[in-house]
Amino acid sequence: MHEVVTISVSQRANHLTTQFFNIQEGYLQLSKEQQVNDSKIFLNSVVDKVSKTISYAPRALLWDARTGNGSLGTYQYSESQDYHFGNEDKFKEQTVIKTHPRIPKSEYQSSLDAGAPLPCLNRENTMYWSDYSKLIYGPSSFNILRNWYHDTENPNQPDFQNLGERKFDRYSIGYDEFTENYLQEFFDGNLHRELEKCDTLQGFNLVSDMESGWGGFSSALLVELRNELPKKAVFSWGHNEDDPFTDDFPMKRLSKKWLPIISNKLRSTINMMQESDLYFPLYAAPGLTNWETAGKSCRIFDSINATISQSNLEQRKTMDYLTTAITLGYSSRNMVTGMVIGDTDYSFCSRVLPFKNSHKPNSTHIFSKSFIDRGNQTHKHHSEPDSRSKMIEMYTHRYFPSDTIPTEFSNDREFVLELESSEKNRDIFKHWNEFVVRYFKNDSDREELKNELSDYASAYESGWYEDEDSGDDDM
């Protein structure tokens, strides 16, 4: 069956995961003749022999802060029991502490439960991913940061103890949080239970944020995941916002205030690349809510996963096939440079300004290019990836967006996704290396980071470059 488990780490990541599984729910509504994918790859089926029905739950593990699950969250003293939902007898001898008002169920969820017409979704009624989630997750899917609370004003950075004094905003905070408080519990508990439901596990999707403590948290999780399951494929997906190195950022000059943000981003990226088979750096555009960002990025996320789960076995690919198609066997070139549909590039890499001695944009070397055609073909010839071929063609069924995806991101249902690995990635690592040289004065891993960034920059080099100057003076 070759199941794929999705590990979603952060509020923003959970929005993308929700949109993806809402699409999976839509496939279940298709008739047997209309089926285009194998639902069991991403969904766990449970047969009720009494009612003779089958229910499906996502093969997913979601991490969030307290109250980040919205109406699905718990507001009680014990994390493992829910005082509000029929367990009152278990709490007779305990003191229940309520730290905040209960979050009401969304109108969309209430309508789903009642079988009533569904309301239109908008920026205001999609604050939480659970506001519009269609599938019912198993109890072992939920993982909560015990000491960090969801902040509705800043949903991507949890607040420590809900005090408004400390944010989940550093790589080191997230890394230590997982290794010190959750590593053993997660791997022996919920992850183990999820893996027991798989017959032949193919791999994982790991979705996270790169600029906050979630980047460190997911990095620590990923390191241990690789140690535990070294032969399973991992595709990592990281959300990246604009920074002083991107072309749309208003600042023309770097300042030290960017140290923690860029530090988070570069450390998280290095870890994702080292521990993943492929890393997809998603661009999170300013002005979009998490619901909108997820609706936009889901076109990419779903396209990759549709390729490995489609019911057409002649066209279906494996995660290993996709990895080879993009890297051509060069494991250090596993960050996807371009994710293009039409005129839109969904990758953060395309936003980065050229480094001072980079080649001109129209002469950037392309190491590999792959196409995923989401048309309505019944059969197409496809090429096999090898070190001599730079262009790979793949085919899958058309896009079936859920009605929870914003209209502006769901109109085009037949398109071609272009995946590219190019010299452009060098710009990112050269910028970051220069940043480390100038700002990381007392960091214990300064030299290690410089070497790693230089190695990655070299991996994406092609041809000759003019000499460059780099010093330790502040910008």
Curated annotation (Swiss-Prot):
GO BP annotations, alphabetical order: mitochondrial genome maintenance; mitochondrion organization; plasmid maintenance
Subcellular compartments: Cytoplasm; Mitochondrion
Signal sequence bounds: none
The keyword Mitochondrion belongs to this UniProt entry's keyword annotation: yes
InterPro entries for the chain: DML1/Misato, DML1/Misato_tubulin, Misato_II_tubulin-like, Tubulin/FtsZ_GTPase_sf
Record's keyword terms, sorted: Cytoplasm, Mitochondrion
GO cellular component terms, A-Z: cytoplasm; mitochondrion
SUPFAM superfamilies: Tubulin nucleotide-binding domain-like
Pfam families: Misat_Tub_SegII, Tubulin_3
Main location, first listed in the record: cytoplasm
Keyword Nucleotide-binding: no
Domain of life: Eukaryota
UniProt similarity note: Belongs to the misato family.
Role noted for this protein: Involved in the partitioning of the mitochondrial organelle and mitochondrial DNA (mtDNA) inheritance.
This protein's name: Protein DML1
Organism annotation: Saccharomyces cerevisiae (strain ATCC 204508 / S288c)
Source organism phylogeny: Eukaryota, Fungi, Dikarya, Ascomycota, Saccharomycotina
Gene for this chain: DML1
